[in-house]
Amino acid sequence: MQQLSFLPGEITPGERSLIQRALKTLDRHLHEPGVAFTSTRAAREWLILNMAGLEREEFRVLYLNNQNQLIAGETLFTGTINRTEVHPREVIKRALYHNAAAVVLAHNHPSGEVTPSKADRLITERLVQALGLVDIRVPDHLIVGGSQVFSFAEHGLL
């Protein structure tokens, strides 16, 4: 479980313990196969829970079936404080391994700034095109920065 550095202000040890227990419970339920990600909001909440407060950039993929239910989720690439190298071939390989009908792409910006960079936009385009060749949809690419999330889909960038 990550640190709670994304929470504003000071919290007592008791509050910290309560929050960590609640996060563990939510995390356990959200990792169960079959959890439906039928909206950006559901994926957003799952990702904030799992990525807020990370100190290095991570690129994660949520693998979904035809009903947008979670098959699996995993970190594919870990980078530095401001960059992660993403390889489309590996994303496709893992999506096919999981027999995914769709994937939600996600990465974090440890700086807290969620505006996508030019590199973020380019890799998203490449991944959408590459995954499309094997009939795998990309409903969204989300960028997590603290408790904020940027959705490529909501901004018309997919």
Residue locations for each model-derived region?
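Long amphipathic N-terminal alpha/beta scaffold segment
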Residues: 17-75
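Active-site-proximal loop/helix of nucleotide/amide-processing enzymes and allied scaffolds
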Residues: 2-20, 42, 67, 77-158
